[in-house]
């Protein structure tokens, strides 16, 4: 008997960033050092007790770009502008499903206010150098790090 193919899950998310509010000037040393001038939005998921980049599953007939923008707004209250597409990450879920997540850089257009819910109870802006101690997934760090390859506005 042929084995059934694992369920495919399509998801998308955003690396929502802003310049640090510390008043530090934006680096002139190139894209890699530019990450040091940025803060990134992380969401806390009480179900898993972890911090991660905002993302979620696509709805039927929804493009990955639409999914990324919708999920970021639902999870953070932030309306964003889609920037460069970053990495695509694939992994198996604990249930053995194949999940593919497409990521985009995003800049905030408007803050509609964060409202805690069952899925996400907090958001936190974190500096690049602090991410490794907070992010639950190494793939989130890889996605953020991928911003450094873009020399133009992301």
Regions found by a protein language model. Name each.
Residues 1-32:
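Acidic, metal-coordinating catalytic segment for phosphate/diphosphate chemistry
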Residues 10, 39, 100-104:
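Short beta-strand micro-motifs in enzyme catalytic cores
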Residues 13, 39, 122:
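Conserved beta-strand and immediately adjacent loop positions that scaffold enzyme active sites
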Residues 20-22, 149-154:
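Generic C-terminal helix-cap and adjacent flexible tail
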Residues 50-54:
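Short small-residue beta-strand/loop micro-motif enriched in glycine and branched aliphatics
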